[in-house]
Amino acid sequence: MLTTHPVALTVDAVDAAKTYLRHETDEEDASILALVTAALVHAEGYLGQLLLERNVVERLPVTTAWQRLGATPVRSVASVTGIPAEGANFLLSPDSYALDINRHHDGWIRIPHPGSAGQVDIAYRAGLVPGWPDLPEAISLAVLRIAAHLHAH
């Protein structure tokens, strides 16, 4: 199970969309923000990667085999929490698991020493760029075009 924190778009994204849509007032800012958010999520689904960095928590079964993390590109891993069948969750020590973030920023994990954990929650940060202003122009324009399509229909 993969849980991503909501996309935190800034005023930059709303302003870019308003310019693209030729809106000059602030009356529709909330709906424009919702459209840009939906467009961004749509683009991320199409591209198969998170565009804007955010926190992710992913639950995986314990195994000694390498497992690929679901969100990409992975920037960093914050923690690995063991989830036992009974009892309280616990942080796994770094020597209990192995992590690899390859050159494509795909995250991989294996758990050779899980203790009593049958599953683990991996908390990590993933995304192509930190914020809207950092997106490549072609990608931000594509997101704006999707938002404009949603706005028109």
Q: Whereabouts are the PLM-identified features?
A:
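Divalent metal-cofactor coordination and adjacent catalytic microenvironments
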Residues: M1-H153
